[in-house]
């Protein structure tokens, strides 16, 4: 054991330990040790997205939680699979690469850059950022297999991933269909429902349009829309046949709208002069035909004349806004599309992939749809079809990556019909351990609203869909791996399975023998990470899954319940018919001090590197891990400062232990717990019990991966129980020169606890733990990470003793409070402390720890008795309730008040014991109870008291001459100990002390000389002119003392 010295210096320690880990390849050696174990722990890393080289502090939190759990499972002796991963495909990478290359749209990738070059640039960007992120994660002590990460761009990963799509095809779940989906006109690709998660407040037109009813002179259907650009694609109008509608005359025209919407519509249009001609059911409108207002500008509309009619759409039509008549554009609205399919209407869409009107859009050809809205409104005016034009600010969906407003388009896409397995998914959710429990209800609610999975994307940088279509017979061929493809390929299969190389691979049709070509689409990026549970295992994943599966734990932020956790579940059900994971842990988001999300644009973002530079890695890790895992955390510099104090206390604890154990040449290898336990004092047995109780709680918490509970249990134990309580109790025993049996027992128990604590704490604060472990532990392994964690020992848990010490803490707090009232410093010993307790159980506890209390309270004697004994130190104070007495007794009130003033004790005793007191005043029985008086108990003159939960502590205000002398001497000792620290003396160093004191205090110092020497490790005390290596003036209780000390030679 090497003694630790000095203050806690995070930067120095952490730089030293990082070098130690790297130079000695500690993780690689640990990996080799772990790989030989039997009991598996399969962890799959939720792959972060390398769109930036620097991870967000929330991502650091995520990785530190993972690291903590993996370290803990290794300490338990498990074969831990700790491969990190990166999610490297998708739009964010494409958009970032486009910016770097100065590309404005998708077509420029093809025309200016070339797909092959673009793919290489995307790959380069993703891998470069992933490499930099890896360094950031390693820098905060994350022990994962960074030499062997999985990347979703790896050919082997892509090849393995195809097995899910093939399995879906074999189950009849994969097909192509038309659906109205959100589309990004800038990225030129579709987005699934769960990708439509970002909204912006946009201002749009809010217009009411008149559709002229055929065969009637002046009657119009009145519709409302905030997307004028969809009117050129209008096919029909929807109503609810059961609603009440009305013909309303306005300015000589008859408008048809829902009865319940008349008032709101007219108010919005500022029309006060209108007349309701008649009302009728919506069923009367069914089949009514109308003339499209823009048919002169959109010639394609003339082909739709037969479909321009009113249909019943049931509850699709609402009365919360609009007119109760809804214009339907089958190519631009999901409900419009479904109702249109029901009635056999065509799907009409005049908008291309770039969000521009096509040739069929007539006058609006080439216009962006949102730009076209202004032109369309003017054309409606010119045709007398615009009833009212306003503006609306509403939440509108934008592309989650490029922030372009989305449009709805009817398009052909490839679907996996996951609605077929919805019931199975819900059943599997019940079999998973969700931490916390609300995770289950959230993902269940999402699955209950499940829609079929749109798996195709019209982009370049992604997993190519393994779907080939025969040019001759349209047969669909789906491959499940590279090997599958090679067995039927006409052309050689490239090493890189990305576009454009894979696009050149033709296959032979297994039906007609013709040539099949791959479809141009890539997979939804959520497909990539959703297959990580097996695709990350490599080419031979089937064999590895048999050995390692299922996944023991996945953990990510709570947003991933609808993201990655759901994607894994979906892929697991398709491929394996079951959930791929056993437990799911959810963590919160990192917010600023006001509870806002942290963004550079808000100016509230804090770089992890800034925190590390100011406080260090362990302080950041500990603060992160102590936050309740599944709750959002608020960043706080103040909290980091308090965390630093805790680590300083931890460091000081090991400095104390290592110093004194070295001083006494203590050799822990000579002993065992069973050897020393019989010599242990009650405080030693208590700290051993507290340690095992703490281990037991940690064990229980970590069954459900509650790292915040483990972190708090560990830190609170060492800071509160060991440092602030136990060491305070044993400090005098450590100063004793002789190695008595009880001192050896104390040392061994403290060593045993501190060794095991630092091993377990390495899961949370690995840098300081490694440093302390290497110095403090006798015969250590090469690294603390190679250690094993012990289980708690029920033999050493004494709950009654722990409860007794809790009472001791409370008594100590009460005693400190009483000292403060009396103005008596803690260093001044008390001649006697009186402790009065309420019950026999507490009496027994306090008597058991009387010796501990003597030390703790700095008292010469303690008297313990039942609460009744407090009466000899107390008196009752009775205050009359004047308003009640006045109302009840009127003119007798003054005499009753005099009576109360002169008989307070007997009144109080009677009311407390009998609930009332009867007073005879002027021959009248006056009954007094708690409504007439307020009773309180006061301590008698010369004493002060303070309550604790189970009783009262009483001390005298006066201190004797001897006690005052001892208090003064202790104040002198405190100054000398401070001066020792200033000289940076070792605890084993002796000193010579010289003191110049007031003349009347010289005899006191002479009297207490031996005590001063024993407490300060002094070998000489000289009274006179001070001299030495350091001389300081001190004011002690208004008196001047000059003290000098020097190191003895």
From Swiss-Prot:
* Broad class of the protein's primary localization: cytoplasm
The record's domain comment reads:
IleRS has two distinct active sites: one for aminoacylation and one for editing. The misactivated valine is translocated from the active site to the editing site, which sterically excludes the correctly activated isoleucine. The single editing site contains two valyl binding pockets, one specific for each substrate (Val-AMP or Val-tRNA(Ile)).
Q: Which residues bind ATP?
A: 600
Q: What is this protein called?
A: Isoleucine--tRNA ligase
Q: Self-association or partners: how does it assemble?
A: Monomer.
Q: Which PROSITE patterns match?
A: AA_TRNA_LIGASE_I
Against InterPro entries, the record matches this protein to: aa-tRNA-synth_I_CS (IPR001412), aa-tRNA-synth_Ia (IPR002300), Anticodon_Ile_ABEc (IPR033709), Ile-tRNA-ligase (IPR002301), Ile-tRNA-ligase_type2 (IPR023586), Ile-tRNA_ligase (IPR050081), M/V/L/I-tRNA-synth_anticd-bd (IPR013155), Rossmann-like_a/b/a_fold (IPR014729)
Q: Where is this motif: 'KMSKS' region?
A: 597-601
* Catalysed reaction, written as an equation: tRNA(Ile) + L-isoleucine + ATP = L-isoleucyl-tRNA(Ile) + AMP + diphosphate
Which coenzyme or cofactor does it need? Zn(2+)
Which terms are listed as keywords in the entry? Aminoacyl-tRNA synthetase, ATP-binding, Cytoplasm, Ligase, Metal-binding, Nucleotide-binding, Protein biosynthesis, Zinc
Question: Which top-level group of life is the source organism from?
Answer: Archaea
Q: Which organism is it from?
A: Saccharolobus islandicus (strain M.14.25 / Kamchatka #1)
């Amino acid at each position: 054991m090497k003694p630790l010295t000095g203050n806690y210096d995070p930067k120095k320690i952490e730089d030293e330990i990082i070098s130690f880990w790297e130079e000695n390849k500690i993780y690689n050696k640990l990996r080799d040790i772990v790989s030989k174990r039997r009991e598996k722990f399969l962890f799959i890393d939720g792959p972060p997205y390398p769109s930036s080289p620097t991870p967000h502090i929330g991502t650091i939190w995520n990785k530190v939680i993972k690291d903590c759990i993996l370290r803990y499972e290794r300490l338990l002796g498990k074969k831990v699979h700790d491969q990190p991963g990166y999610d490297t495909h998708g739009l964010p990478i494409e958009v970032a690469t486009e910016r770097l290359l100065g590309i404005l749209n998708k077509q420029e990738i093809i025309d200016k850059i070339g797909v092959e070059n673009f793919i290489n640039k995307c790959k380069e960007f993703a891998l470069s950022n992933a490499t930099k992120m890896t360094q950031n994660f390693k820098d905060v002590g994350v022990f994962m297999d960074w030499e062997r990460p999985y990347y979703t761009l790896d050919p082997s990963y892509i090849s393995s991933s195809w097995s899910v799509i093939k399995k879906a095809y074999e189950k009849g779940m994969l097909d192509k269909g038309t659906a109205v989906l959100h589309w990004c006109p800038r990225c030129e690709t579709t987005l699934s429902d769960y990708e439509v998660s970002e909204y912006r407040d946009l201002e749009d037109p809010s217009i009411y349009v008149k559709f002229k009813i055929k065969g009637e002179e002046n009657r119009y259907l009145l519709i409302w829309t905030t997307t004028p650009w969809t009117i050129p694609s209008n096919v029909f109008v929807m109503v609810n046949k059961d609603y009440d509608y009305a013909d309303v005359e306005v300015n000589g025209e008859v408008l048809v709208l829902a009865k319940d919407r008349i008032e709101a519509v007219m108010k919005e249009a500022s029309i006060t002069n209108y007349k309701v001609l008649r009302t009728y059911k919506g069923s009367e409108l069914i089949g009514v035909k109308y003339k499209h207002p823009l048919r002169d500008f959109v010639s394609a509309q003339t082909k739709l004349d037969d479909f321009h009619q009113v249909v019943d759409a049931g509850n699709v039509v609402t009365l919360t806004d609009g007119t109760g008549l809804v214009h339907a554009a089958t190519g631009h609205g999901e409900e419009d599309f479904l109702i249109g399919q029901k009635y056999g209407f065509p799907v009409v869409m005049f908008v291309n992939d770039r969000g521009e009107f096509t040739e069929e859009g007539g006058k609006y050809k080439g216009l962006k749809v949102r730009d076209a809205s202004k032109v369309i409104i003017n054309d409606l005016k010119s045709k007398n079809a615009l009833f009212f034009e306003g503006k609306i600010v509403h939440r509108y969906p934008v592309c989650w990556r490029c922030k372009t407003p989305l449009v709805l388009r009817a398009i052909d896409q490839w679907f996996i019909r996951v609605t077929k397995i919805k019931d199975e998914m819900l059943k599997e959710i019940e079999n998973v351990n969700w931490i916390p429990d609300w995770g289950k209800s959230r993902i269940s609610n999402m699955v209950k609203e499940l829609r079929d999975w749109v798996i195709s994307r019209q982009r370049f940088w992604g997993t190519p869909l393994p779907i080939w279509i025969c040019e001759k017979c349209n047969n669909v061929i789906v491959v499940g791996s590279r090997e599958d493809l090679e067995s039927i390929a006409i052309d050689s299969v490239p090493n890189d399975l990305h576009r454009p190389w894979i696009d050149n691979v033709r296959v032979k049709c297994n039906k007609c023998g013709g040539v099949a070509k791959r479809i141009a689409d890539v997979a939804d990026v959520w497909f990539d990470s959703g297959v990580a549970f097996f695709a990350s295992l490599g080419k031979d994943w089937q064999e590895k899954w048999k050995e390692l599966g299922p996944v023991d734990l996945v953990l990510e932020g709570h947003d991933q319940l609808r993201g990655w956790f759901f994607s894994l579940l979906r892929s697991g059900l398709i491929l394996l018919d079951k959930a791929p994971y056993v437990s799911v842990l959810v963590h919160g988001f990192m917010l600023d001090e006001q509870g806002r999300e942290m963004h550079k644009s808000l100016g509230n973002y804090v770089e992890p590197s800034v925190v590390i530079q100011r406080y260090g890695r362990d302080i950041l890790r500990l603060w992160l891990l102590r936050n309740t895992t599944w709750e959002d955390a608020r960043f706080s510099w103040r909290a980091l400062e308090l965390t630093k104090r805790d680590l300083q206390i931890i460091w000081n604890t090991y400095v104390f232990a290592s110093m004194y154990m070295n001083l006494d040449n203590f050799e822990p290898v000579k002993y065992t717990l069973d050897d020393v336990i019989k010599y242990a004092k009650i405080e030693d047995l208590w700290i051993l019990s507290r340690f095992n109780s703490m281990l037991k709680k940690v064990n229980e918490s970590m069954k459900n991966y509650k790292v915040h509970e483990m972190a708090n249990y560990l830190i609170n134990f060492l800071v509160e129980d060991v440092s602030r309580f136990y060491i305070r109790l044993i400090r005098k025993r450590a100063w004793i020169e002789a190695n008595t049996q009880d001192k050896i027992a104390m040392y061994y128990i403290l060593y045993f606890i501190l060794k095991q604590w630092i091993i377990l704490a390495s899961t949370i604060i690995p840098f300081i733990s490694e440093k302390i472990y290497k110095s403090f532990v006798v015969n250590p392994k090469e690294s603390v990470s190679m250690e094993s964690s012990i289980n708690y020992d029920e033999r050493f848990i004494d709950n009654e003793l722990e409860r007794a010490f809790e009472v001791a803490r409370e008594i100590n707090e009460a005693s400190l409070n009483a000292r403060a009232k009396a103005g008596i410093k803690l260093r001044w010993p008390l001649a006697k402390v009186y402790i009065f307790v309420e019950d026999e159980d507490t009496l027994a506890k306090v008597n058991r720890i009387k010796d501990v209390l003597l030390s703790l309270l700095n008292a010469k004697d303690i008297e313990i008795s039942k609460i009744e004994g407090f009466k000899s130190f107390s008196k009752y104070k009775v205050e009359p309730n004047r308003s009640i007495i006045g109302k009840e007794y009127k003119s007798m009130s003054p005499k009753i008040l005099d009576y109360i003033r002169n008989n307070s004790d007997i009144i109080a005793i009677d009311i407390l014991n009998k609930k009332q007191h009867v007073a005879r005043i002027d021959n009248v029985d006056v009954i007094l109870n708690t409504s007439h008086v307020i009773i309180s108990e006061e301590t008698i003159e010369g004493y002060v008291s303070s309550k604790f939960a189970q009783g009262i502590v009483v001390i005298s205000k006066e201190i004797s001459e001897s006690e005052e002398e001892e208090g003064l001497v202790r104040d002198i000792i405190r100054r000398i100990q401070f001066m020792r620290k200033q000289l940076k003396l070792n605890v084993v160093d002796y000193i010579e002390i010289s003191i110049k004191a007031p003349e009347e205090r010289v005899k006191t110092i002479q009297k207490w000389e031996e005590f001063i020497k024993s407490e300060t490790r002094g070998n000489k005390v000289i009274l006179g002119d001070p001299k030495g290596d350091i001389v300081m003036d001190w004011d002690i209780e208004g008196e001047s003392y000059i003290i000098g000390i020097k190191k003895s030679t």
